[in-house]
From Swiss-Prot:
Amino acids binding [4Fe-4S] cluster 1: 49, 52, 57, 74
Residues annotated as binding [4Fe-4S] cluster 3: 127, 147, 150, 153
Main location: membrane
Amino-acid positions noted as binding [4Fe-4S] cluster 2 in the UniProt annotation, renumbered to this chain: 117, 120, 123, 157
Keyword Cell membrane attached: yes
InterPro entries: 4Fe-4S_dom (IPR007202), 4Fe4S_Fe-S-bd (IPR017896), 4Fe4S_Fe_S_CS (IPR017900), 4Fe4S_Ferredoxin_RnfB (IPR050395), Elect_transpt_cplx_RnfB/RsxB (IPR010207), RnfB/RsxB_Proteobac (IPR016463)
Protein name (record): Ion-translocating oxidoreductase complex subunit B
The organism's taxonomic lineage, starting at the top: Bacteria, Pseudomonadati, Pseudomonadota, Gammaproteobacteria, Enterobacterales
Molecular function (Gene Ontology), one example: metal ion binding
GO cellular component: plasma membrane
Gene: rsxB
Length: 192
């Protein structure tokens, strides 16, 4: 019985010593992250889609914060994310698709041909925002409100039943282009 207590005491002492060493090492050799990169990474949608040309949101945030990369390359985040990053960095907003000549990119949506879907769930596993629902060997469908059009679900599909299509405007999504509405100013006479 005495040897058990010696073993327990020795293991406890070793745990305390190694814990203290690890605690000291974590503070002594800590790497400080750039707070601007942290804030940019918090603004990005974390979909890890790669449409910006970087393998994920964190590398893109580092490129924007440290290397001066353009702030308009996040397609899933769109204009809202670009404006937040521009405000954070105190820079001028840029067109949200990365191409200066096209100010309003067409929103794309993944569409599944349900007749050809075999229910393999590879598209569900590839979707970074969980916009595809379905079960194994059952029909899958895309929730249009969540789909960012990142194209990551298209390649894994073995039957090639997924394609990206432009989103059609509906009465709910259509917006007035106020610059094309003719406005006529009528002078008003003041009567005393």
């Amino acid at each position: 019985m005495n040897t058990i207590w010696i073993a327990v005491g020795a293991l406890t002492l070793l745990g305390l010593v190694f814990g203290a060493i690890l605690g000291y090492a974590s503070r002594r050799f800590a790497v400080e992250d750039d707070p601007v990169v942290e804030k940019i990474d918090a603004i990005l949608p974390q979909s890890q889609c790669g449409q910006c040309g970087y393998p994920g949101c964190r590398p893109y945030a580092e490129a924007v914060g440290l290397q001066g990369e353009k702030i308009n390359r996040c397609a899933p985040g769109g204009e809202a994310v670009m404006l937040k990053i521009a405000e954070l960095l105190n820079v001028e907003p840029q067109p949200c698709d990365g191409e200066e000549q096209q100010a309003a990119p067409v929103r794309m949506l993944a569409v599944i041909d349900e007749n050809n879907c075999i229910g393999c769930t590879k598209c569900i596993q590839a979707c970074p925002v969980d916009a595809i629902v379905g079960a194994t060997r059952a029909m899958h469908t895309v929730m249009s409100d969540l789909c960012t059009g990142c194209n990551l679900c298209v390649d894994p599909c073995p039957t090639h039943c997924i394609e990206l299509r432009p989103v059609n405007e509906t009465p709910d999504s259509w917006k007035w282009d106020l610059n094309t509405i003719p406005v006529r100013i009528i002078p008003v006479e003041q009567h005393a």
